[in-house]
């Protein structure tokens, strides 16, 4: 698309004002109608990908819920506690220090902390709902595998490399809980 636009602009610069009637008569389709058609195509493609992703995610979660060791909450979050962790339990107002790996349901890694690196920190109340709910199930030092439905992740909008309506899988180690009362 960018190459087509670049070519059209070069042609415009060589032939005159792109808004003049004389210039527009040279084209079977106006640049505006081409742009509108392209945007319509993108919207239809995104809607199709969203529907396919939703169907695949629902199928994955339905099969996954039947696996031994997988528990399902009322919200639809699925999880496996690998290690329960200690007595210090996180709340939404706490800052958590975690190591994690996030994958799509096909196993494609879309984000992770460095394997030998430092954990990242974030306020629990500021992350996706699947993490908010799931990480409150383990204590400091615990490990959990989260299978997050799209509505508890990025929903219909998707996010950087994650298609709309995608279920996500996370392996998370809760390294430390920074209690809100201790941070003030």
Positions of PLM-derived features:
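Cross-family detector of peptidyl-prolyl cis-trans isomerase
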Residues: 1-184
């Amino acid at each position: 698309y960018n190459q087509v636009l670049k070519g059209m602009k070069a042609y415009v610069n060589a032939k005159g004002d792109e808004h003049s009637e004389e210039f527009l008569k040279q084209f079977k389709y106006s640049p505006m109608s081409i742009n509108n058609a392209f945007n319509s195509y993108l919207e239809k493609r995104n809607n199709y990908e969203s529907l396919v992703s939703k169907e695949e995610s629902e199928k994955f979660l339905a099969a996954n819920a039947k696996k031994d060791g997988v528990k399902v909450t009322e919200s639809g979050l699925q999880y496996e506690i690998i290690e329960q962790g200690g007595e210090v339990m996180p709340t939404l107002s706490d800052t958590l220090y975690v190591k994690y790996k996030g994958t799509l349901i096909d196993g494609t890694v879309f984000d992770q902390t460095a394997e030998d690196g430092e954990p990242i920190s974030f306020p629990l109340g500021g992350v996706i709902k699947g993490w908010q709910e799931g990480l409150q199930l383990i204590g400091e030092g615990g490990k959990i595998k989260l299978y997050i439905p799209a509505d508890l992740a990025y929903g219909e909008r998707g996010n950087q490399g994650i298609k709309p309506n995608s279920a996500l899988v996370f392996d998370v180690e809760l390294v430390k809980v920074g209690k809100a009362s201790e941070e003030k």
